[in-house]
Amino acid sequence: MPVITLPDGSHRSFAEPVTVHDVAADIGAGLAKAALAGKVNGKLVDTSHLIENDTELAIVTERDEDGVDIIRHSTAHLMAMAVQELFPGAQVTIGPVIENGFYYDFKYERPFTNEDMARIEKRMEELAKQDLPVSRSIMSRDEAIKLFNEMGEEYKVRIIEDIPGEEDLSFYRQGDFIDLCRGPHVPSTGKLKAFKLTKVAGAYWRGDTSNEQLQRIYGTAWGNKKDLKAYLHRLEEAEKRDHRKIGKKLGLFHMQEEAPGMVFWHPDGWSLYQEVEQYMRAQQHKHGYKEIKTPQVVSRTLWEKSGHWDKFKDDMFTTESEKHDYAIKPMNCPCHVQVFNQGLKSYKDLPLRLAEFGSCHRNEASGALHGLMRVRGFTQDDAHIFCEEDAIQEEVSAFIAMLHEIYADFGFSEILYKLSTRPEKRVGSDEVWDKSEAALEQALNREGVDWELLPGEGAFYGPKIEFSLKDCLGRVWQCGTIQVDFSMPGRLGAQYVADNSERKTPVMLHRAVLGSFERFIGILIEEYEGAFPTWLAPTQVAVLNITDKQRDYCQNLAKKLDSSGYRVNADLRNEKIGFKIREHTLNKVPYLVVVGDKEIENNAVAVRTRKGEDLGTMSVDDFEKLLAADVERKGRTKTEI
């Protein structure tokens, strides 16, 4: 007689084995109707799962994160079923759940079109309305191979052949469609009411470019139409804010096939980049970092000593000279240890904070490249802190405080914190790990922030904290990190003389705030839709004359503002003032200063913002004060200008 313990601690007893659905129905008809799956002793199962022993059970519905994932997985199967009904001969491969949706890869004789996508989605809606039961069955590996061979599903056969022979396999069927899957799935297709196909793209079998090309159809699915509508709205907003489109429109940068994954910065984009770099340089100087510069091309022997050659060789750009192998550095850390190693250090020299705007290159797969967000050539705001074990907490706390200040200046206030702790395979003693993990935890608690613990997710050489930004669309971008490293300093011979005159190996803290400049600038472009805070704007002020009579005044005003350190464009073209205002507004220049005869008479300017707000006429000195206050404020108030 199974006794079911529910999440609220209550118990329900049954005289005989029951399914998850039976339990939901016993609780209430509404819950039975809403049930998508169950969680039995922490494991997700179908609603048809039979419970024979005492069990802890949670009923999973569309309100649960697990429930939404199950809806997405089931919708992927629904899409595959629709594709095979509409396009006989289409072979299915894999169809996983991804963030906010799902995809399925197909092999078909021709590319799917937008018209095909509309037909597929319509057929999915029809199949969902049929409320087809979804059932689970078990087969042996040999039975499954025989079945899918008979069905002509070559790719499924290949997948099954890679599974150990003694393992029984689970399959899910709805109507005439059957697919290999661990599950669980919704009990019937009628549970799938809110989905949308979003795009079709190319893909390669097993993600290998040397294999045959497939077609990948992406979709999104949600528990209800309200959530779907909200997500599609966010997608539209993200499309409007796409940094690649805005970058092209504003003339910030471009990329081309002759240099895949590398950025061609244009003058305005480089101005933005330089402003970010100079700001970071000043912040690091203020917080006690010493800036260095290390080589970009380094011998294979150093990468072998550091351990990177064995682990990351395939991701490095390599070359050969005079019978020696070299690699363009994919990261800066081994080079920073070389700087530390020049001259014996004392405990009095620690902590030593070495920072570099390090130019790195990684041979990312071409299919993974995405504008500024995923590149092959990038610059990191990289720094390494060499310190004693007892200084870890203090250094981490100081870093977090600096990171908060920097993110606030860029306009980000919502930060997510994740602490990753020791994995099974690791270097260093448990005592050292205990001490380091406690130091990171105490540093987070000292800041009074909420943080998430990720047990076992640390690197083999030390625990870490990751810092992620949440943008205006609710998207999360992992940017900052601080990582304790017990391994590399020892591997590369770093030592210092301790206060007892013994030689010891320092702890090294890897840290970054922005991550890569390229990616962070991409995030800024999308966050502000190109309308950057005044301190970052490539052009901060456009000075516009109405007629040629104001030319000299405008030129002198522009020179005055330029000499005060502002980025100014004096637009003296023989164009109508309305045309010039519109053009600079579209270019998202924060302040438009208009000069006519009246302004000259009063040594004044008429000021407008890019949002169309008329700030009226004011003296040049007052405008400079307004401009200075706005620049000083940075991104700490997101009041748009």
UniProtKB/Swiss-Prot annotation:
It is an enzyme of class 6 (ligase). Pfam families: HGTP_anticodon, TGS, tRNA-synt_2b, tRNA_SAD. Keywords: Aminoacyl-tRNA synthetase, ATP-binding, Cytoplasm, Ligase, Metal-binding, Nucleotide-binding, Protein biosynthesis, RNA-binding, tRNA-binding, Zinc. Binds 1 zinc ion per subunit. PROSITE patterns: AA_TRNA_LIGASE_II (PS50862), TGS (PS51880). It catalyses: tRNA(Thr) + L-threonine + ATP = L-threonyl-tRNA(Thr) + AMP + diphosphate + H(+). InterPro entries: aa-tRNA-synt_IIb (IPR002314), aa-tRNA-synth_II (IPR006195), aa-tRNA-synth_II/BPL/LPL (IPR045864), Anticodon-bd (IPR004154), Anticodon-bd_dom_sf (IPR036621), Beta-grasp_dom_sf (IPR012675), TGS (IPR004095), TGS-like (IPR012676). The keyword Transit peptide does not apply. One of its GO terms (molecular function) is metal ion binding. SUPFAM superfamilies: Class II aaRS ABD-related, Class II aaRS and biotin synthetases, TGS-like, ThrRS/AlaRS common domain. Zn(2+) binds at C333, H384, H510. The keyword tRNA-binding applies. Residues 1-61 form the TGS domain. It is found in: Cytoplasm. One of its GO terms (cellular component) is cytosol. Residues 242-533 are annotated as: Catalytic. Its main location: cytoplasm. One of its GO terms (biological process) is threonyl-tRNA aminoacylation. Belongs to the class-II aminoacyl-tRNA synthetase family. Catalyzes the attachment of threonine to tRNA(Thr) in a two-step reaction: L-threonine is first activated by ATP to form Thr-AMP and then transferred to the acceptor end of tRNA(Thr). Also edits incorrectly charged L-seryl-tRNA(Thr). This is Threonine--tRNA ligase. It comes from Marinobacter nauticus (strain ATCC 700491 / DSM 11845 / VT8). The gene is thrS.
